[in-house]
Amino acid sequence: MQSNKLRMAIRSTAAVAILGVAAQAQAVSFETGGYQTDIYGYARLNASYDIDSNQALSTRSGSYSGLVNNDDAADGHFGADAFQSRIGVKTVSPEGVKINVEGDFRGGGGGSLRLRHAYGEYNGVLMGQTWSNFTSFVGNTSTLDFDSLPGVAGYQSRTTQARYTTGPLSLSLEDPQSSFVTAPANAAQKDSLPALTARLQDSAGGLSYSAALLAHQVGYDTGSEDESAMGFATFVAAKIALSDMITVQGSLSYTDGANSYLYRSGENFGAASAYVDPASGDVETISGYGGTVGAGFNLGGGRSINVGYGIVEVDWDDAEDDGVAVAGQSESNSAVMANYQWTPVKNVMMGVEYAFLKRENVSGDDGDASRILFAAQYNF
């Protein structure tokens, strides 16, 4: 049965691959009144075949929601979309002020325009929305899955912020991200302070590395009760080139009261950061950790193979001991992803990827799924 499913998956992705032929797009760059402007982006097709239960999100990335107890779920699901496609504008003024606005089509669950970047930068000071400073791609293994491996370094998303960068050091004040286990606490959840981050990122020879810290407040205010606690997060990430052909990379993360920054923990993109003790009303933080390891192999001729593993674990023991209902919460999310990518002509990338996703809840219930992803991307 499993071999039949795999054959169906291969046939489906091969059929899509035949369609992956298009002309190369042209970049748009021009100067007006001393402003240097670039229009950039790409068109991208993502197609997936879920060998087991249907775990596809928009952009056909894999989801951990609904993965537990999926043994009896319908299997063999194909789908495709172009929601990852994006377009952006960058301009630099004669005085050196940089402005960037970019969007894609993953908004509203897929198909609507979504703002990715909108910021200005001058003399190391950046204000607006862009990648959180508590993010690094240094230790990431290249994946076709848009949402990638659990446990990669930091928030891995964009947020509004004020950032200052000098050399390899960046400091920022950011829109904070947090949630509670229970709905009543979430309804009264309150952010009184921005998240504070510091990141060091540099390289030396064949080694690239990054380390970061984050602190924020987690609290609630019902009008009659007002409680809060401090949450913290940290990560380290590195990549080393063993030769012209081989790189090895990975990351380690730890959070306590900041699981929104523990990538792909919980249902999909961040477990609860805290809970309210039913007896005292105090805010109690929840800790977690994660990590990734991977390797990339450059085969030459625009071809590469990439293999990565990632896992996140959340510690719900204290919440469970205090009588909070957490049996259905995800305790562990993990994934293996392996892909082959090639560039048939300049600015065109195609690839195929196998992924194995696994989740285990606090209750001990678990589930897993295999899936195959095909991608074709045309840059301009």
PLM-predicted stretches and their roles:
Residues V28-S61, S65-S179, K190-L193, T197, ...:
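Outer membrane beta-barrel
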Residues S85-V89, A118, A162, A198, ...:
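Membrane-embedded beta-strands of outer-membrane beta-barrel proteins
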Residues V28-G33, K90-V101, S210, L214-H216, ...:
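Transmembrane beta-barrel strand/turn architecture of Gram-negative outer membrane proteins
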Residues M1-F30:
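Cleavable N-terminal export/targeting peptides
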Residues D202-S330, S334:
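Detector for outer-membrane/organellar transmembrane beta-barrel domains
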Residues S53-S58, R106-L115, V138-D145, Q177-S192, ...:
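Outer-membrane beta-barrel translocator domains and adjoining extracellular loop/strand segments
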